Amino acid sequence: MPKETRSFAVLGLGGFGSTVALELARFGNRVIGADLDERKVSRMVPHLHSAIILDATDEAAMREAGIDRYDVALVAIGRDIKASILATMNLRLLGVGTIWSKASDRTHHRILSKLGADRVILPEQEMGRHSAQMLHNPAVQDYVSLGNGFSVVNIIVPEKLDGEAVSALAIGSENDIRLLG
């Protein structure tokens, strides 16, 4: 059964926003990208369902652009904290079902959370933690934090364990470790 696609509005087409928008579109989702910068919008036109010049601080302009008809919105406005806050507030007022917002620091994070963002992202801190985990342990190829202290980790199996039966490894006997295959 094919995966159901959703529609996404990405407000702010800088490095972070444009990367998210392009990936969502690559997955087959309907994506509108919006930014005040005409050059950023122009670069996205060939790749997205729609790309528009839009002031996300203007609730009426967002409604006119049909942002309220999208399932999920991402506020990826980076440098202008006031614009980020107003865009998040406008999305909530428009009734967008799910709102993710990018924050620049902890205070910004708290404000966006209080405004009703469903998830607030601190990309530099999150990527910094991710990089530190992988640098700390060279056997870790990649990992995903699941929250509450749980992670899925992709590790390089040492040569000495090559060919060993999984049952002989005593995985989980001392730690709460589970093998996924």
Question: What residue spans do the PLM features occupy?
Answer:
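Phosphate-bearing ligand-interacting subdomains
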Residues: S42-S131, L135-N137, I156
